[in-house]
């Protein structure tokens, strides 16, 4: 993959050059930054990027992960045997729904292999959760310990990487946790599981406060992106940062904002080494991660 990076460097312009420059930033970050964030959106886990992300965590390229509930959903579903099949962006969604399929871009999955599988997994481990108050990173560890090493959560649990999910209720995992608590009321007299997101914030505060240098690879936008850069401001901003996105900045959205905008908020240092790659992550993330 490093040969491809060097080929991109020789192209000398446009996004190919940005990919080569991003590799340089990430390579230095892995060597110099003690806290290395990996932020990504859940949709990526519906693709084969799941294996690349798990491998990067397993190799300890990143030691803190911030993602969405959807990432957990897809990771668990795939671990439970769900088949995510190639399709088309132009499939008839009315027809798909009638046949019992979900569509995510040009990936399709049977409805019975998504929510029901996630719920089955969570409910199988309810008793380990009842009566506990858990941060999302603690929940992710408990779930990851029950999943194979080639999953994202499984790799993180074994590598000691903490996985934070600030929007934990926004997906099948969150709904399954609610069902888990419904069962607790009938079987355990109300000894429910509690998810304490402020405990996550306290842990992030300690991670950032105790860091010497902060780095982040941020793929996509939304809550997983903002949570990383929000906390970085309390240490003066990120020292190294690479964004990969196809969002535009002209609507003022967080997802489309470039690293330079974050400087005005104190979330990225003026001296930071930063690169923005305008590209589909499925095209460039495998190259970057395998080259490191």
UniProtKB/Swiss-Prot annotation:
PANTHER family: DEOXYHYPUSINE SYNTHASE. The keyword Transcription does not apply. Keywords: Hypusine biosynthesis, NAD, Transferase. Its EC number is 2.5.1.46. The lineage of its organism: Archaea, Thermoproteota, Thermoprotei, Thermoproteales, Thermoproteaceae. It holds the Pfam family DS. GO terms for biological process: spermidine metabolic process. GO terms for cellular component: cytoplasm. Catalyzes the NAD-dependent oxidative cleavage of spermidine and the subsequent transfer of the butylamine moiety of spermidine to the epsilon-amino group of a specific lysine residue of the eIF-5A precursor protein to form the intermediate deoxyhypusine residue. Belongs to the deoxyhypusine synthase family. It comes from Pyrobaculum aerophilum (strain ATCC 51768 / DSM 7523 / JCM 9630 / CIP 104966 / NBRC 100827 / IM2). One of its GO terms (molecular function) is deoxyhypusine synthase activity. Its cofactor is NAD(+). Pathway: Protein modification; eIF5A hypusination. InterPro entries: Deoxyhypus_synthase_arc, Deoxyhypusine_synthase, Deoxyhypusine_synthase_sf, DHS-like_NAD/FAD-binding_dom. HAMAP family: DHS (MF_00153). This is Probable deoxyhypusine synthase. It catalyses: [eIF5A protein]-L-lysine + spermidine = [eIF5A protein]-deoxyhypusine + propane-1,3-diamine. It comes from the Archaea. The active site is at 267 (nucleophile).
